[in-house]
Amino acid sequence: MKFFGRLNNIHSRELIKYIWTAGLAFAAIALMFFGYYYKDRYVRVDDKSPLDISIDQLEIAVRENPENPEARVALAEFYLGKGLYSQAIEQTDQVLSTFPENTGALLISGITYTRSGQSQKAIAPLEKFIDLRKDDPMALSDTALQTAYYFLGESYNTLGQADKALPALEAALKINSTDADALFQAGLSSQTMNDHEKAIEFFDRAVLFVPDFTEAYAGMIESYTALNKPDHSDYARGMQAFSLKDYKTAQRYLESAREALPDFASAHFGLALTYEQLNRLDDALISVKIALQLDPNNFSLQQVQERIETAIKAQG
């Protein structure tokens, strides 16, 4: 998985941002608890706690009070989480026809259109949501706003409009610079605009946070090839194989990259990880130490060295 502990059975990595069940607080149907899973973290708008409400309860709430926008938004979010896209859109449309600036309905509508492959229809609600939230004093810590920027960027990428996608994705990264999905999509935007150096920078940052990000390595291969850097392409192919648990293939490519690029810390690091999986711990330790000499401030390298040293000691 891209993010450790992340949910399974979701689309390819670049399409992953999962929205899950929200709730409706029932003290005679009072407050909506709008929440969503954002990668492997649970984010709650306004820091309200969600309740575990069944779909039957949510549907009953809407039938009993069809004019309540919060009830419809909660139901729409539940439908979105279940992949029932047409039902989700039906609910958000009902809300937006009366309350065109309901931010919950706008965000769910935009995400639902993106997830259902209707990227063009996603643009308007996402842009309106962003316009309503971007000038808030807390905008730079607004995770819902960050998510809207991400989906707007993904939608523009899908539509082949990289020049519009990249600013949205960069705005998402200002709020959360560790969002590997946004970094990957920004890399795709840069590729489309033939800025392969910048694309590689984005892909590199993505795999820093998610070492097994297969699609990011595929992006690296494409950009390194475009830049006529075959040895760096070997590194990316090796790490792609590593992410797919094909460690022998990874070893072959990474050893080739190491020989051609002895000062490239990432090749040594990739080899350390590969040797570790092949239980060649002494070789892994040598490789990670070389990587640390080349990149002494890399905390990830320090952690891997400690892990390998601990494993060697455990073997006696």
Describe the residue ranges of each PLM region.
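Flexible helix-coil transition and linker loops at the boundaries of alpha-helical arrays
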Residues: 61-64, 131-145
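Helix-start (N-cap) detector for alpha-helical repeat units in TPR-like alpha-solenoids
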Residues: 69-70, 103-104, 137, 145-146, ...
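Structural marker of alpha-solenoid helical repeat scaffolds
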Residues: 64, 98-99, 132, 175, ...
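Register position in tetratricopeptide repeats
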Residues: 81, 115, 151, 158, ...
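N-terminal leader/linker segments that initiate helical-solenoid repeat arrays
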Residues: 2-74, 81-84, 90-91, 97
